[in-house]
Amino acid sequence: MVRVAIAGAAGRMGRNLIKAVNGSQYAVLAAASEHPESSLIGVDVGEMAGLGKSGIVIVDDLAKAVDDFDVIIDFTLPISTLKNIELCQEHNKAIVIGTTGFSEPGKELIDQAAKEIPIVMAPNYSVGVNVVFKLLEKAAKIMGDYCDIEIIEAHHRYKVDAPSGTAIGMGEAIAGAMGNKLDDVAVYTREGITGERTKNEIGFATIRAGDIVGEHTAMFADIGERVEITHKATDRMTFANGAVRASHWLHQKSPGFYTMHDVLDLDQI
């Protein structure tokens, strides 16, 4: 049984993660945190999530509960996640990272930390999305050289980064399968007279509206036919359940940088 700490416990994902841990037979909720200015500091986390009294109060820093947990699950902001990574390094803890929007220096810090502690990091913890990543690799190898490739993603109005981490992950899967780096072929905006589409580019389109949980489509379009691979999430619990699954898998693993491909053993497919 893995003892889990939830960072950002009062957020949309934090609350779902608490429910996912509560419903898991492999994990137990051991700690929870919120930012220091939160009015929920000191509140019972189970009551906050509508699950009844848990005996675990929300703290403003997981360092205050460091002896109580084995793994942190962190879906917060880059600055908070990097702080929790440092805590894990200091105390030999593991961390599951669902935070997106890291700068290049931030990514480098994560890579360095993975030499000391076990880390799972993924743009999306849905099992279905990670199956889609694998399908995209195969489609790109077969169709990529003669198709136009576009990625369309849609999320709720409150999402603060664009394109989504999942859309970037889809682009990386496709570009990598074709022997390219996404940074070299990605086109994130089109406006005005852009000229004809270049051969290898991967286009991105972003929608922010209403309460859309998450929708992603990769389009492989040729003259006369088009293949679309789509994933639609209707409940954030799918991400939360995947992250809890990853925390159980990561517990007692050797230091290293892992992804959901490793958790789900997708490279064997």
Swiss-Prot record:
Which residues participate directly in catalysis? H155 (proton donor/acceptor), K159 (proton donor)
HAMAP family noted in UniProt: DapB (MF_00102)
Name of the protein in its database record = 4-hydroxy-tetrahydrodipicolinate reductase
Main localization category: cytoplasm
GO biological process terms, semicolon-separated: diaminopimelate biosynthetic process; lysine biosynthetic process via diaminopimelate
What organism does this protein naturally occur in?
Aliivibrio salmonicida (strain LFI1238) (Vibrio salmonicida (strain LFI1238))
Q: Which gene encodes it?
A: dapB
Give a Gene Ontology cellular component term annotated to this protein.
Answer: cytosol
What the record says about family reads:
Belongs to the DapB family.
